[in-house]
């Protein structure tokens, strides 16, 4: 099956600290690559706990610049080593006080391709996301990766008709053998 794409999706339990979460995901990526995965996507805010059940400014410490932060750089090297496309949902700081729930997309050669910022930010009891994140401002990009066109959603955006329509409208229309994958 020449057109078969093997994808890995990872959702893990919180280990208690950022570094051990990153190591856990590095190990999982290596394991997925050994099993033939060509692309891997981690869970929302992958290196931290899902902290949005409370409103506490201490969690701003989990923010990183994308693409210039240490986690993006670290996984660029890993993507290149494993020859694997990676989707890394992280807590992004654009500037002090401006934060996003963002997924960085890294190609199989380690190239940073861009990012998707979560568009739909819930704000109900137990999901105080607007305390932490601004709505994304970069649209619904499609990334041309080594495995094909990839669109990225984070959490509630997958239920948005507008997001799906925008991703579909930018997808290739030819009978090309290139694949298109939307990761939610």
Task: Report each predicted region and the residues it spans.
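Short, acidic/polar
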Residues: 20-29, 158-166
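Structural motif
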Residues: 9, 41, 87, 152, ...
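Extreme N-terminal starter segment of soluble prokaryotic enzymes
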Residues: 2-7
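Single-residue recognition of alpha-helix boundary sites
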Residues: 22, 54-55, 118, 168
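Short polar catalytic/cofactor-binding loops
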Residues: 11-16
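Cys-nucleophile CN-hydrolase/nitrilase-fold catalytic domain and related Cys-dependent amidase chemistry
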Residues: 18, 27-109, 115, 181-184
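Active-site catalytic loop in hydrolytic enzyme cores
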Residues: 64-67, 77, 94-184
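Residue-level detector of alpha-helical recognition elements and their boundaries
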Residues: 22, 36, 40, 124-125, ...
